[in-house]
Amino acid sequence: MTAHGASREATAAARERLDALTDSTSVDVVQLADELAAVTALLDREVSLRRVLTDPAQAAEAKAELAGRLFGSQIGGPATDLVTGMVRSRWSQSRDLVDAVEELADIADLTAAQRAGVLDDVEDELFRFGRIVSSNPALRAALTDRTADKAARSELVHSLLGGRATATTERLVTRLVTTPRGRSLEAGLESLSKLAAERRDRLVAVVTTAVPLSDTQKQRLGAALATLYGRQMHLNIDVDPEVLGGMRVQVGDEVINGSIADRLEDARRRMAS
């Protein structure tokens, strides 16, 4: 097994344990998300601790016992079980463990949204927030200003999303803005959007059109893309008059072009060749 493969398999195993745990409605997933986020922050700060917890020379049970002693009195049983299970696994880099714990925190919050029936809203809100940030350099600068304290950045997010978005979206964005951990805001929002889509095992299609689509058009497009890719598709609709007509669809790294502008560009290329 490669080092990269080791962390990938450890993360996959942790996600399976989280899914099994959250299948029980008795688990408070919002509290679980908070506790996992707190563990993430601690491990991110304490480099020596995370190195000990991921040291392959140390016995798995000894690392699990250490994690249990450190975290057991500070977080609940479900979070402790997840973390101790994770430190039993093999990790290629100590930072991979931190990334995985953070991912579980995000998934727990998304599970709360799914239980509440607002996961679609969260997906749409994350997408729209990303578009707003990308079109407003001053806002982006304020949200990513490392000289501002966390409380100020948290308050800024609340002023933007409080009462306008779901509690889950505000929590996820606040955590990303206050604790970016080296990620750009755009990369963090994209990662959250992908996790949200995965909650329903769906792909995300970013659809750019010259004019807004009707509900019927959205349904037909979603059905056509689902047939094409063999998986349910979530549509993020972006209206851009410069498309001129038709639409542009991006699924992951694949782009499906069907706009007038693209056909004009193709014609220009053929004439120039």
Swiss-Prot record:
One MF annotation (Gene Ontology) recorded for this entry: proton-transporting ATP synthase activity, rotational mechanism
Bilayer topology annotation: Peripheral membrane protein
Keyword Disulfide bond: no
Gene Ontology, cellular component aspect: plasma membrane; proton-transporting ATP synthase complex
Superkingdom to which the source organism belongs: Bacteria
Main localization of the protein described in the UniProt heading: membrane
Pfam families per record: OSCP
Annotated signal peptide: none
Record keywords: ATP synthesis, Cell membrane, CF(1), Hydrogen ion transport, Ion transport, Membrane, Transport
Gene3D superfamilies xrefs: N-terminal domain of the delta subunit of the F1F0-ATP synthase
PROSITE patterns on file: ATPASE_DELTA (PS00389)
Subcellular location field: Cell membrane
Subunit structure: F-type ATPases have 2 components, F(1) - the catalytic core - and F(0) - the membrane proton channel. F(1) has five subunits: alpha(3), beta(3), gamma(1), delta(1), epsilon(1). F(0) has three main subunits: a(1), b(2) and c(10-14). The alpha and beta chains form an alternating ring which encloses part of the gamma chain. F(1) is attached to F(0) by a central stalk formed by the gamma and epsilon chains, while a peripheral stalk is formed by the delta and b chains.
Entry function: F(1)F(0) ATP synthase produces ATP from ADP in the presence of a proton or sodium gradient. F-type ATPases consist of two structural domains, F(1) containing the extramembraneous catalytic core and F(0) containing the membrane proton channel, linked together by a central stalk and a peripheral stalk. During catalysis, ATP synthesis in the catalytic domain of F(1) is coupled via a rotary mechanism of the central stalk subunits to proton translocation.
Family: Belongs to the ATPase delta chain family.
The protein's name in its UniProt record: ATP synthase subunit delta
Organism: Streptomyces avermitilis (strain ATCC 31267 / DSM 46492 / JCM 5070 / NBRC 14893 / NCIMB 12804 / NRRL 8165 / MA-4680)
